[in-house]
Structures are given as C-alpha cells and as structure tokens.
A protein has these predicted regions:
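N-terminal strand-loop element at the rim of the active site
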Residues: 6-13, 24-69
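A short helix/loop element that forms part of the nucleotide-sugar donor recognition site in Leloir-type
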Residues: 180-193
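Nucleotide-activated donor-binding/catalytic signature segment of Leloir-type glycosyltransferases, i.e.
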Residues: 243-259
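Aromatic "clamp/platform" in nucleotide-sugar-dependent glycosyltransferases that forms part
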Residues: 260, 279
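Short hydrophobic beta-strand element within catalytic cores of glycosyltransferases
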Residues: 296-299, 309
Length: 374
C-alpha cells in the first residue's frame, strides 16, 4: 500500500478527469489517496474509505495584489505530506503544480517523491511564454519522474524547452465501466432525432484552438448530402461565434447546442461520428471516449491525435483546415454501413488494446515503484 497525494485542476477538463479516475483506480487497489486541490474534483462522485480530500485555502491579504495560490498549495502539500506520511506527490501539469510540489518537498520533514504528468497546455501554450519557460523547465528537471500523455508531447517538450529529463509516455485512458456502447434510442427521441438521421458529435471547451467553426462547416457539407444532426457539447469563448455561424448557414434545425454535459457516454452511444478538428491536441481524450463507445472519429493530423486515431481503420486523419476532405470522409463512412461497422468495431478493439485502464494503471504502478526504489 502506497500513500499518494494527487493534485490536478478539479474542474471539467481532460487532465482533471484522468487524475481523478487514476486516484479512484489506485484506491480500488488498496492504496491511500489524498487529493490536494482548490475544490473537490468533480469526478470524485462517491465515497471511498481510502480517498481523502484536502482543500487548498487561499488567504486574501491586502499586501498581495493577487491571491498566492501556488504558495498556498505548496504549504498545504507539505502539511499533508508530514501529517499523512505521503510517499509520492503526483501532480498534473508542470505549471504551477510541479513547482508547488518541489517547494513542498523542500518544506516537508517527511521524505516525498514528486511525479509530474504533462498534459499539454503547460507546454504548448505556456511553454511559448518566456516568463514561464524557465519555470516550467525547472519543474520538469527537478521532478523525480516525469510522464507525458503522448510521444508528440514528449517531442514538443524537448524541442521547446530543451529539457534533458527522461520523460516516459503513459497514455490517457477512460473508465470502461462508464464508457461503453448501449442502446439509448429514447435519448434520440428526446432530442427529436429521427431514426433515419445520422448523429455527428463534437465535444470540447469551445476555445479557438478547437476550431469549432471547421466542425460546423464540415457538418454543413455532410448535411447537404445526407440526413444528419450535429450535437455540440461543451461551452466556452467560441460558443457565441459558433451559434452565429450556424444561423448564417441556416443550420439551426440541424445543430443542437447542448452546453456542458455529464452524460457524455450516453451522448456518444447515440452518435455515429466524432469530429475533432483542433489545431493542437496533446492526446484528445474525447477521441478515446468515442472509440470506447464504438464511434469512428475524424481528427486533424496534429499533436497526439495520430497516436489515438488509426487512419483508415478506426477513423480518418485530415490536414488542419481541410474541411472538404473531412466532410468527404464523413459522408463515405455514414453512407457505407458495412465500412462504418468495421470502423466501429475496430475503434473499440484499438482502444482496448492500446489504452485500457488496467494497462495504464500497471504502468503508473511500475513508475511509482521505480521512483520509491531510488
């Protein structure tokens, strides 16, 4: 049994989901898990006798222009490490979590190892900022072990930051007990989706990098050839722009804006095709969620997406911005039942073979053992 502290962003988002699900699986193996976060992780949806939550409280002193979250986090980490005899602090994101964990390791009396998992934004966005570049590099170099969610992210990290640290690739995963294909025709009826209409789905945080407009233009081309509906799941800065584009293209009756949803696996179960046409993705966990629900995917040939989608077998890859090719592939799949079924079956097999949670959990356990043996 290991005592492991986990820090992540507790809100909706791929990294928070992965961190929380990992903690739950480790707890089910008998490990003692301590979440040290600013609020309760939203996926921590039931009581576990060996999972504990420690809230990071931020004091608002007038002398500080902004509340010092990273320092408050480090102090809370050190406190929990000493009181609970934490052996490993596993932090998700180098900035600021790895920096806080390294400071906590220095502050704590009890010895603790720091494992950092890179998810992407800290490298692909903050890594460009000269203000943070050296700080992120320090967080990576001073960690006892570092993992990344794709080979693409490892390459980007080495190239952008010039770090020498060995970075292991441990892919993302999904909870197979939650994500699986089921017959939910009643949900189609609730959304007024007819039995002869195909369902295309896009799930994201609607930031500019997700290129939701490309998704809508691609769907417009698909819908001009076959009966289809588009489910837009999520919310963010580009939602209003997306809504205006749908109106401009006259697609209001074919596009459903569903906002943030918790029942993602149910929505995927009624879907026939997943679109993710981002300009940058370190992994694209929504693709894996779709594949586990037997939904073929079309994604851009960027970042870690080619490591998740097997072109011509579980879905298709297109160049960034090539909505014409994306639509052509979509029409090809949605009008060829035999091909769609083959892609659907292969998507599930590929997901189970390469990203099964048991395999990923084994990799993390081996990493923890290695770190503690040093």
């Amino acid at each position: 049994m290991k005592r492991i502290g986990i820090t992540c962003y507790p809100t909706l988002g791929g990294s928070g989901v992965i961190a929380t699900e990992l903690g739950k699986m480790l707890a089910e193996q008998g490990h003692e898990i301590h979440f040290i976060t600013s609020s309760m992780p939203f996926r921590l949806d039931r009581i576990y006798p060996n999972i504990y939550y420690h809230e990071v409280e931020i004091s608002n002193y007038p002398v500080f222009q902004y509340p010092p979250y990273d320092l408050a986090l480090a102090a809370k980490m050190a406190e929990v490490v000493d009181r609970e005899h934490i052996e490993i602090l596993h932090v998700h994101y180098a900035m600021p979590h790895a920096i806080s964990a390294i400071l906590a390791r220095d502050l704590a009396d009890h010895p603790v190892k720091v494992v950092t998992t890179l998810h992407g934004t800290d490298i692909t966005v903050l890594g460009f900022d000269p203000t943070f570049k050296k700080m992120i590099s320090h967080g990576i170099e001073q960690s006892d072990a570092v993992t990344a969610v794709s080979n693409s992210l490892v390459k980007q990290t080495k190239e952008k930051l010039g770090v020498k640290k060995d970075i292991s690739v441990i892919y993302n995963f999904v909870n197979e007990q939650e994500y699986y294909k089921r017959n939910l025709n009643h949900i189609k009826k609730q959304y007024n989706i007819k039995s002869d209409e195909k369902v295309v789905i896009h799930i994201s945080n609607f930031r500019k990098v997700k290129r939701v407009e490309d998704v809508i233009h691609t769907f417009s081309k698909i819908q001009s050839k076959i009966k289809a509906k588009l489910l837009l799941v999520g919310d963010g800065p580009e939602t209003s722009t997306a809504f205006q584009l749908v109106k401009k293209l006259g697609l209001e009756q074919y596009v459903l804006f569903l906002g943030k949803q918790k029942n993602i696996s149910e929505l995927l179960s009624i879907s026939d095709l997943k679109l993710l046409l981002s300009e940058q993705e370190s992994f694209g966990v929504v693709l894996l969620e779709a594949m586990t629900c037997k939904v073929p995917c079309i994604g851009t040939r960027v970042g870690g997406i080619p490591e998740v989608v097997e072109h011509g077998k579980t879905g298709y890859l297109v160049e960034l911005g090539d909505i014409t090719q994306a639509a052509a592939y979509g029409i090809e799949l949605l009008t060829n039942e035999e091909k769609w079924q083959a892609f659907s079956d292969d998507a599930l097999v590929f997901a189970k073979t390469h990203f099964h949670s048991e395999h990923i959990l084994k990799q993390y356990n081996e990493l923890y053992d290695d770190v503690l043996s040093r």
